[in-house]
Amino acid sequence: MGLSDGEWELVLKTWGKVEADIPGHGETVFVRLFTGHPETLEKFDKFKHLKTEGEMKASEDLKKQGVTVLTALGGILKKKGHHEAEIQPLAQSHATKHKIPIKYLEFISDAIIHVLQSKHPAEFGADAQGAMKKALELFRNDIAAKYKELGFQG
């Protein structure tokens, strides 16, 4: 299920928009995730108390988490599918320490797509959306395979 060179080009061009404002994109992605799927808050001890969108937007910890996640994801996307070295420790920590179900990675992927659509409608057309969805699915599938190796049924 690899991506073509053209698809990777679309993914990385779009990701350039994210990198221009990682804190803003990260915050918006996590607010979208937590408001759309409040059950995901339970996996984040430092965010469990956040009940409203306003509280979420005011949280410096949430902003930092957004930067951490999107920076890591950007590094993975830039590997164009050759991300074994990056995926291994991520899968290990998400399976054994954080116990993040794959379903939650689908939720955050959907949040990323939504945020890109809303922040960059002109640059994130159907082709770019399709390529990004494919890249995020590749990432999730590779994490899921590592989860299986680790015996985590997330």
Swiss-Prot record:
Gene Ontology biological process: removal of superoxide radicals
Reactions catalysed according to its record: Fe(III)-heme b-[protein] + nitric oxide + H2O = Fe(II)-heme b-[protein] + nitrite + 2 H(+); H2O2 + AH2 = A + 2 H2O
Superkingdom field: Eukaryota
Gene3D superfamilies: 6.10.140.2100, 6.10.140.2110
Biological role: Monomeric heme protein which primary function is to store oxygen and facilitate its diffusion within muscle tissues. Reversibly binds oxygen through a pentacoordinated heme iron and enables its timely and efficient release as needed during periods of heightened demand. Depending on the oxidative conditions of tissues and cells, and in addition to its ability to bind oxygen, it also has a nitrite reductase activity whereby it regulates the production of bioactive nitric oxide.
Gene name linked to the record: MB
Homology family: Belongs to the globin family.
Complexes and interactors: Monomeric.
Membrane-spanning ranges: none
Residues noted as binding heme b in the record, renumbered to the chain: H94
Protein's organism: Elephas maximus (Indian elephant)
GO MF term (any one): heme binding
PROSITE patterns noted in UniProt: GLOBIN
Entry-linked Pfam families: Globin (PF00042)
Residues annotated with Phosphoserine modification: S4
Keywords for this protein: Cytoplasm, Heme, Iron, Metal-binding, Muscle protein, Oxidoreductase, Oxygen transport, Phosphoprotein, Transport
Domain Globin positions: 2-148
Phosphothreonine PTM sites in chain numbering: T68
GO cellular component labels: extracellular exosome; sarcoplasm
EC number from the UniProt entry: 1.7.-.-, 1.11.1.-
Name of this chain's protein: Myoglobin
Compartments (UniProt record): Cytoplasm, Sarcoplasm
